[in-house]
């Protein structure tokens, strides 16, 4: 080794350490500048309300300066979009949309028919002896014989189908009334000449929830009005449903009559409910008569066999004498 020459092993470590320090210093400066730019960009975005509190620097992706205007425009449109949607979207808008009239539906709709017998002087007072209630689909919900409060004078078997034997298993009127009203309350009640059934039940059903099938012919011919037509359930069933009811000599079946009334209602259900919805807004004086108070139609000759009406004579003179015949059969005279 030449004198004065520095050993190679001692010279290299010092150069290496210097280079390492420079590299670390330069990296630190580079990181500091990046951090400063990061913090400046973050502060700018927060000032423009484009950046909320982030979970951490590592999870926050910031746009480059060239992308910032586009982000700002997108954010502005994003903030304005809910306002436009709240005013125009159908789900949030309060503007009324034309809809069909609400329909009662199967659960809220029942049909009823009652059969009456004669009590009081000459059997001229009608009292409930059988009641049947069917559902919208025609299922029998109630069908029981009922013992009148007064002694029966005329069973009216030819039309009511009630005989003395039926009264052996009949239930008291008060019991039947409670059971039936539980089925009717809160529901749309369908029936033919319903004022007679409600009168026998000693009950007044809300007019808005009453569908009397005596209106059906008028709905089919003039959907814009509701005027009761004096036509029998038997004729309506034959002409509109093409079915025969109330045939034979065993009297009417309240179950059959209730089912027929429901079928007639379903025939014009849509038009009827639309008419009811529109008439609800009309003044009270423009509405038709209430089916719960009209008693004249009950004794109209179209509701009873011709031989009965012919034998009654002049109804306005106090009514006819009771027909002779089998026990339990007789004619019902008109009210004085």
Curated annotation (Swiss-Prot):
Compositional bias segments (type: Basic residues): 24-37
Polar residues composition-biased segments: 8-20
Annotated Gene Ontology cellular component terms: nuclear membrane; nucleolus; nucleoplasm
Keyword Hydrolase (UniProt): yes
Residue positions of motif Nuclear localization signal: 164-187
Compositionally biased tracts (Low complexity): 56-65
Exonuclease domain ranges (all copies): 109-265
Domain of life: Eukaryota
Chief site of localization: nucleus
Class in the EC hierarchy, top level: hydrolase
Location in the cell: Nucleus; Nucleus, Nucleolus
Extent of motif Nucleolar localization signal: 25-33
Record EC number: 3.1.-.-
Keywords: Apoptosis, DNA damage, Exonuclease, Hydrolase, Nuclease, Nucleus
Name this protein carries in UniProt: Apoptosis-enhancing nuclease
Organism: Mus musculus
């Amino acid at each position: 080794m030449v004198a004065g020459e520095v050993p190679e092993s001692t010279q290299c470590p010092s150069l290496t350490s210097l280079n390492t320090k420079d590299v670390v210093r330069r990296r630190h400066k580079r990181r500091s500048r990046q951090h400063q730019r990061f913090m400046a960009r973050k502060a700018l975005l927060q000032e423009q309300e484009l950046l909320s509190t982030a979970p951490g620097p590592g999870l926050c992706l910031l746009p480059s300066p060239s992308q910032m205007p586009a982000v700002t425009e997108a954010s502005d449109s994003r903030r304005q979009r809910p306002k436009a949607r709240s005013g125009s979207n159908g789900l949030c808008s309060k503007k009324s949309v034309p809809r069909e009239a609400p329909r009662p539906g199967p659960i809220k709709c029942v049909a009823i028919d009652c059969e009456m017998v004669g009590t009081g002087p000459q059997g001229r007072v009608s009292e409930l002896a059988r009641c049947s209630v069917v559902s919208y689909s025609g299922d029998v919900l109630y069908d029981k014989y009922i013992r009148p409060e007064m002694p029966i004078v005329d069973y009216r078997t030819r039309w009511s189908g009630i005989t003395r034997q039926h009264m052996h298993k009949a239930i008291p009127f008060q019991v039947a009334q409670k059971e039936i009203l539980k089925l009717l309350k809160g529901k749309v009640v369908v029936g033919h000449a319903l004022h007679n059934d409600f009168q026998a039940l000693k009950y007044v059903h809300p007019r808005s929830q009453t569908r009397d099938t005596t209106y059906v012919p008028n709905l089919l011919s003039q959907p814009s009005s509701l005027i009761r037509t004096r036509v029998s359930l038997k004729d309506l069933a034959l002409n509109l449903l093409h079915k025969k009811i109330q045939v034979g000599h065993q009297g009417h079946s309240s179950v059959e009559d209730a089912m027929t009334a429901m079928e007639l209602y379903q025939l014009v259900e849509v038009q009827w409910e639309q008419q009811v919805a529109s008439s609800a807004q009309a003044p009270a004086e423009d509405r038709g008569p209430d089916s719960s108070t009209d008693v004249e139609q009950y004794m109209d000759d179209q509701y009873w066999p011709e031989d009965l009406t012919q034998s009654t004579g002049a109804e306005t003179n106090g009514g006819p004498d009771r027909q002779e015949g089998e026990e339990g059969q007789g004619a019902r005279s008109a009210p004085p």
